[in-house]
Amino acid sequence: MSQATPTPPTALPDESLPPVQPPNAGFLVQLFVIPGLIVLVMVLVWTLIKWLPQMGNDAETNVKALEGSGANRWQAAVNLANLLRGDTTGELKRNEELAGRLAAKLHQEISDARTGEDAQLLRVYLATALGEFHVDAGLPVLVEAINTEELADRKPSLRAAAVRSVAVLSSNLKKVTGEPVTDSAAVAAVIEASRESDSLLRTTAAFALGEIGGSAADDRLRVLLDDFAHPYARYNAATALARRGEPAVVDVLAELLTTDEPPETSDKDTTDEQVAQRMRLVTSGLDAVLALAKANPSADLDSIILVLEKLTQDESREIRKRAQVVLRELQGRKSAA
């Protein structure tokens, strides 16, 4: 029986707002509520995985399936990414051989440059799976994918998926080794991606730079603070730098907190979807404020306190409650100073 091809994953704010705590490998599942940053409009919607047909629940079965010549091989890549993400023992995540096989397959698929939808989905989900590992065997091919030329209207984007996977991989590596991705080629590729005009790619790259860290990444994030043409990239830069304690982000965070309408929406977005996006933006901004206060106790947040006081009267109950918590925290810190 033929399988219906699901709508390709999209990116939203927060999930694009990958969260005030650095997002972990599972942040892709939530897209835009990603704990730690603000990844607006930039995350794969993993909810589609819940209904995708399963091709076997073990890694080897799925690897053989995607290495074969059958149709819908991308489903095997989805299954592998799902298995890796749910691997609580770490056995799969630490499997260098498995990572190497997936990396080799992605390299082959990039070289073949097939244009069919199945081939495109396979490349995207292979890249996604490689980000779930706790070993960096897939990093070189992710860099290759980021540097690959693709049609501007190609969706889902392999380049964006690869950038996103570098972010997740960096978060994973930092968790298990204490060090994020520092490979110069990877950092350079993500920085170049942050200069692209495509909003999703640029926004995703800004998020990834926050996960990578390092002086070169931070320098680029500071430039993106003035990227008014791409608000979500700008917000991701601000939330990343907030976690580093940079007071220069205060004005951008204040702007984020006073968002009435999401700056980047689609004509297809319903009113409810826009309200939800606005809530994710504001709550992510609130998390970033707390991160800044924690990282830099001496930062002048008086202008933020004024904004928070207004948010305690917001029509959204969730925003009101969260703003009250953050306001009390800042006022307490100020009193103790």
Locate each region found by the language model.
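Structural detector for internal amphipathic alpha-helices that build alpha-solenoid repeat scaffolds
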Residues: 31-34, 46-54, 73-91, 118-135, ...
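Alpha-helical transmembrane segments
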Residues: 39-46
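N-terminal intrinsically disordered, acidic low-complexity segments at the extreme N-terminus
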Residues: 1-20
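Hydrophilic extracytoplasmic domains
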Residues: 302-337
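N-terminal Sec-pathway targeting helices
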Residues: 22-38
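Short coil turns that connect the paired helices of HEAT/ARM alpha-solenoid repeats
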Residues: 66-71, 104, 108-121, 148-155, ...
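Amphipathic alpha-helical scaffolding segments comprising HEAT/armadillo-like alpha-solenoid repeats
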Residues: 52-64, 88-113, 135-149, 172-194, ...
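Short extracytoplasmic/periplasmic juxtamembrane "stem" segments immediately C-terminal to an N-terminal membrane anchor
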Residues: 59-78
